[in-house]
Design a protein with these regions (language model features):
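Canonical position 11/12 of the leucine-rich repeat
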Residues: 69, 82-84, 96-97, 106-108, ...
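N-terminal capping/linker segments that flank leucine-rich repeat
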Residues: 1-106, 115-117, 169-207
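Ankyrin-repeat and related helical/solenoid repeat scaffolds used for protein-protein interactions
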Residues: 133-173
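Canonical leucine-rich repeat
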Residues: 63, 72, 85-86, 100, ...
Length: 207
């Protein structure tokens, strides 16, 4: 005969309820307190969030999504100049985020997304990005950078579930471009500013 503990464990359902933020200054402030690791931000009356450059060597905007937050509310827009961003697995954080839809007004310097286990979609709106790196996100299916302009580097590698990739515009001085994933590999490849095309066998041919 099974014990009472075994019966309870069999029928116990663990549910993480998605946190809902109100569409007002207090809701956006609460989101930033929950999700941004630093304090270099300010919420405006129009619900936009100003991000200041930090004086240290770290990222200006590090996301640390708790388990009950899986995306950025669509009414939040971030603003800043030459802002660096990180979304990586960090301790107990970023384990359940599924969508990273970044609405940004200004310019981005470095964007790093690495090893986020449940992330399925990355969308960044029309913005200039110096360098972006998206690596080792096992469930990532879609990257949408259409409308963005990359000026130095764009790399997306070892994202084994990637199916859809919408490329950014590439500036004339792009130094590195490497979109190489099991499900999707871009035929264009740039190394040290030299452009190549991958032929039908994957061999690089200088353009």
């Amino acid at each position: 005969m099974r014990s009472l503990v075994e019966v309870i464990n069999e029928n116990l359902i663990y549910e993480v309820r998605e946190k809902v933020y109100s569409k007002d200054v207090s809701g956006v402030t609460e989101f930033c307190n929950d999700v941004l690791s630093g304090d270099n931000w300010k919420v405006n009356k129009d619900l936009s969030v100003d991000i200041d450059k930090t004086s240290g060597s770290g990222y200006d905007m590090s996301f640390v999504f708790p388990n009950n937050v899986t995306k950025i509310p669509d009414f939040i827009k971030f603003k800043g100049r030459d802002v660096s961003i990180a979304l990586t697995t960090s301790g107990p954080y970023n384990k359940n985020i599924e969508e990273f839809n970044l609405n940004f007004d200004g310019t981005l310097s470095t964007v790093t997304v690495n090893n986020v286990p449940k992330l399925k979609e990355i969308t960044i709106n029309d913005v200039q990005i110096e360098s972006i790196f998206i690596d080792k996100c096992a469930k990532l299916e879609t990257i949408d950078l259409s409308g963005c302009e990359v000026t130095d580097s764009a790399c997306a590698r070892k994202n084994k579930s990637l199916k859809t990739y919408k490329a950014p515009d590439l500036g004339k001085k792009v130094n590195t471009y490497n979109i190489d994933n099991p499900g999707y590999t871009d035929e264009l490849y740039i190394m040290d500013g030299v452009r190549y095309k991958r032929d039908e066998k994957g061999k690089l041919v200088k353009i």
